[in-house]
Each structure stands twice: as structure tokens, then as C-alpha cells.
């Protein structure tokens, strides 16, 4: 562990190191709070919110601690559940605020990790990188598992760096209980405990205990959980709508990292090379984590930006390692900050799907039969047919047939660019789905359309009368 030197305080020049962190946390939290109400009362920021928040709410309203669903472990649901107890229905806003708090804790954890490894100024660089990275900013507003996983990973890495191997094992278990890829933290744990195999064995046992204590039904219903986890992994490996024409996985995920970090990624790459050359304990822990985590992404064809999120604090640490260029790195953070502010500004608008929902409620009689694309607001009081999301390798949804819909008495169809733009961009992979959109537009009357503009954010939405 690198000892803190008096010179580190002089290097900061930010009004004192203990003032810089609170100021950074206040600014980062403020940035994340803007747009936190986007799409409410519907989970339009991320469809996974619909899988997590209602289950957390149900846990404090009589359903018990078993979620009955294991695409993710249960720690995040358990964390959210107490804050749902006073609500009469699932509160996406409350859940998002809890995740914002976890995101702020992750920024502080990045500071702590790098302060212990490379000094105070490097810690500020890592914390600022985490605070500003577009991916971290965006997912801190979403009541999903990615920011909690990143927090757990950062705390685990920090404990490894300072040699608290057993406590690091507990943190590994908690990170894995937030999201299954946390198990990859066992690789840097091996590096941190190299030659101390008894301590590693204890840490591994503590990791299992921490996981079992916070996701007990994954253990108790292991068959169901293993099946759900394997299905999620297969889906990620097979790809997802929108990534059909992407670059190969190594290039695609570097692009996702660039989208989050901008030119700071170059500084982090140089820091990674230096870490591999010098190989201090901190260097090895960070380098092993980054390399092993990135390597496992190579098997994935669904190139979601959230998959690189746990790398952000570690890459910020490696960028901060180059203390001699820290002022330049801080200036380079202006690029992702500009991107984050731009994205945040869009979240101050009304989502187009909310506007379409209001139009339907005001103009379509209750009880009417409506077919809708995924990721659209609930239409209470209507008889709704939910169209399935087209995906690589999945069978064609028979409801994506205009004649069939008409034959079943469905008179309205809601299409959204969040789905159909991706279908049309990969029409060679989805010829029948493309024909469905074109036939619906030819044979139906467009009674409402809303586009993203100065008033509205989100995808275009069309309501067609069949």
C-alpha cells in the first residue's frame, strides 16, 4: 500500500483534499438528479426497472423474500425493498434515488481505492472520471443492477489494494449478489492474495457466505436460478436487437468505453501498460481485473454500454496513476462531461411515449383492443396485445401480422422507433418484421404521431388505426 505523503495535499490545489471530494459528490449527485423523473410514472428509462422495482415493492407488501425470478441475484431488490414499504404501488422514483445514492458512494469508493494505491491527486482523477463518465451518470438514474455492481467491485478492489483480503472476499460476494458478473472479481483477489492461500481460501468462503446471505433463494432454488442465469447469458452471447451490424466484440466494447470516457480512455490505456510493467500490488489488482473482465466480454454479441460500467472506476484509477499528467487528464474530462450534460438535457423533456399515452387515453375508447410495441407505458382499461421484441435466433412473433391483428378485433397499433428503427436498420435479419411495419403503414391510418423535438425526448411514436 502506498503511504499518504504530505506532498499529496499540496499537489491537489482544489481547496484541500477533504473539500474536493464533497464538492465532487455534490456536483455529481446534482447532475444525476436532473432527469430522475424522466418517463414517470412508467419505467421508460430502462425496461429492466419493470423487472426489479415491482418485485422489491412486493417484498414489503406480503409476497415474501423470494422474488421467484433469478435473471439477477436479489441483493439489489433487498436494498430497494425497505424504501418501497410506504408506497401503495411500486415507486420508480424512490428506487432511482436509492441508486443515485449508491452511485455517489461508488464515486467515493473510487477516490478511496486510488488514494490508497497512488495518492490523493490520483484519487481525485479516478473519482472525477467516475462522476463524469456518461455511462455511470446515465445508469445512476436507473433502478437496475449495474451501478450497485460497480460500487461493489470498486470497494472490493480497494480492499484488495490495502491487503484486507478477507474483507475483500465479503465485498466480492456482495458484488456478485448485485449482479452475477461480480464473480470475476475472484481473479484480482487471486492476484492480491498470491502466496497467501490460506487467506485466499478464507476470503473465498466469506464471499460465498456473503452471496448466500444476500441472495439466499439463488442457493435454495439453485436449479431455477441456474436456468435463468444461463438463459440470460445465452441471450447476451447470441446478441440483441440493434447490434446485428456492430463491429466485433473487442472493437465494439472499446467504442462503448470511448463513449463513456472519451480521450481519458487513452490515458487509462497508458496507465494499464505502466501497471503491467511496474507490477505493484495495486497495479496487479487493477490490471488483472481490467484484463479478465474485458476478456469475458469477448464472448458477448449484445454490446450494451452497461456491460463496461464496472471497468470505469478501475480505468479512472489507471488514468490517475499518471500523476504527472493529472492536470491534462482533468481537462480531458471536459469531453465526457459535455456528453453527460447533453444527455441529461434531453431527460428534462417529456418522453414521446408519455405524449402518445395521453393521446390514447383521451381519444381511444376504454376497452378497445390495442397492439403495442415493447417499452411503452401500460394502458390500463384497454385490452392490450404486447408485441414481442424481435431478437436474433428467436422465432417470429405471430402477432406481427396485420391480417391476424384485424382478425382478432385489434383496431389500433402503437409502434415506436425504440424498436422499429432497430428492426429497419437490420432488415436483412428481420424481413418478416420489416414487412409488418411497412404493411401496417400502408394499410392503416396514422391517427397520431409524435417526434422527438424541442418539447419531447425519446423515440418517435405512431398510433395506427388498422
Label the predicted regions.
Residues 37, 41, 76, 217-219, ...:
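Catalytic lumenal/periplasmic loop and adjoining terminal transmembrane helix
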Residues 21-22, 204-209, 317-342:
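Signature aromatic-anchored transmembrane alpha helix within multi-pass, membrane-resident enzymes
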Residues 26, 89, 93-118, 155:
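Transmembrane-helix motifs of polytopic, lipid-linked glycan transferases
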Residues 105, 109, 129, 148-171, ...:
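Specific aromatic-rich, kink-prone transmembrane helix
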Residues 5, 9, 159-167, 184-208, ...:
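Perimembrane helix-loop-helix junctions
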Residues 138-148, 304-305:
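Short acidic/glycine- and proline-prone juxtamembrane loop motifs at membrane-interface regions
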Residues 25-31, 126-131, 154, 158, ...:
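Short helix- or helix-capping micro-motifs
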Residues 34, 51-55, 72, 78, ...:
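Transmembrane-lumen/periplasm boundary regions of multi-pass, lipid-linked membrane glycan transferases
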Amino acid at each position: 500500500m502506498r503511504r499518504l505523503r504530505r506532498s499529496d495535499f499540496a499537489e491537489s490545489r482544489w481547496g484541500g483534499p477533504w473539500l474536493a471530494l464533497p464538492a465532487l459528490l455534490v456536483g455529481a449527485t446534482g447532475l444525476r438528479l436532473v432527469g430522475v423523473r424522466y418517463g414517470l410514472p412508467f419505467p421508460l428509462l430502462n425496461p429492466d426497472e419493470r423487472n426489479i422495482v415491482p418485485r422489491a415493492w412486493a417484498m414489503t407488501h406480503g409476497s415474501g423474500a423470494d422474488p421467484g425470478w433469478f435473471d439477477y441475484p436479489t441483493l439489489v431488490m433487498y436494498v430497494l425493498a425497505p424504501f418501497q414499504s410506504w408506497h401503495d404501488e411500486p415507486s420508480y422514483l424512490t428506487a432511482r434515488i436509492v441508486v443515485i445514492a449508491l452511485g455517489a458512494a461508488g464515486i467515493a469508493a473510487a477516490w478511496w481505492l486510488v488514494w490508497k494505491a497512488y495518492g490523493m491527486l490520483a484519487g481525485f482523477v479516478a473519482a472525477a472520471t467516475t462522476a463524469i463518465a456518461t455511462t455511470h451518470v446515465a445508469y445512476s438514474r436507473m433502478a437496475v443492477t449495474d451501478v450497485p455492481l460497480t460500487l461493489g467491485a470498486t470497494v472490493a478492489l480497494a480492499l484488495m489494494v490495502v491487503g484486507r483480503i478477507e474483507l475483500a472476499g465479503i465485498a466480492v460476494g456482495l458484488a456478485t449478489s448485485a449482479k452475477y458478473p461480480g464473480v470475476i472479481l475472484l481473479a484480482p483477489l487471486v492476484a492480491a492474495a498470491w502466496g497467501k492461500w490460506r487467506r485466499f481460501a478464507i476470503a473465498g468462503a466469506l464471499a460465498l457466505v456473503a452471496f448466500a446471505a444476500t441472495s439466499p433463494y439463488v442457493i435454495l432454488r439453485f436449479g431455477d436460478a441456474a436456468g435463468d442465469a444461463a438463459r440470460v447469458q445465452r441471450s447476451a452471447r447470441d446478441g440483441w436487437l440493434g447490434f446485428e451490424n456492430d463491429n466485433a466484440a473487442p472493437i465494439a466494447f472499446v467504442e462503448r468505453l470511448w463513449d463513456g470516457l472519451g480521450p481519458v480512455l487513452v490515458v487509462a490505456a497508458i496507465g494499464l501498460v505502466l501497471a503491467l510493467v511496474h507490477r505493484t500490488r495495486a497495479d496487479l489488482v487493477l490490471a488483472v481485473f481490467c484484463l479478465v473482465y474485458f476478456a469475458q466480454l469477448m464472448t458477448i454479441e449484445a454490446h450494451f454500454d452497461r456491460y463496461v460500467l464496472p471497468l470505469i472506476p478501475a480505468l479512472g484509477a489507471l488514468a490517475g496513476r499518471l500523476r504527472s499528467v493529472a492536470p491534462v487528464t482533468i481537462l480531458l474530462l471536459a469531453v465526457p462531461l459535455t456528453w453527460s450534460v447533453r444527455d441529461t438535457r434531453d431527460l428534462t423533456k417529456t418522453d414521446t411515449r408519455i405524449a402518445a399515452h395521453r393521446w390514447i387515453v383521451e381519444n381511444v375508447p376504454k376497452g378497445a383492443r390495442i397492439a403495442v410495441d415493447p417499452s411503452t407505458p401500460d394502458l390500463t382499461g384497454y385490452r392490450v396485445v404486447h408485441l414481442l421484441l424481435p431478437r436474433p435466433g428467436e422465432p417470429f412473433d405471430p402477432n406481427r401480422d396485420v391480417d391476424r391483428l384485424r382478425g382478432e378485433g385489434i383496431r389500433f397499433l402503437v409502434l415506436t422507433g425504440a424498436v422499429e428503427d432497430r428492426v429497419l436498420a437490420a432488415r436483412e435479419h428481420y424481413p418478416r418484421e420489416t414487412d409488418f411495419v411497412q404493411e401496417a403503414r400502408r394499410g392503416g391510418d396514422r391517427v397520431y404521431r409524435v417526434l422527438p423535438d424541442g418539447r419531447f425526448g425519446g423515440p418517435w411514436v405512431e398510433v395506427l388505426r388498422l
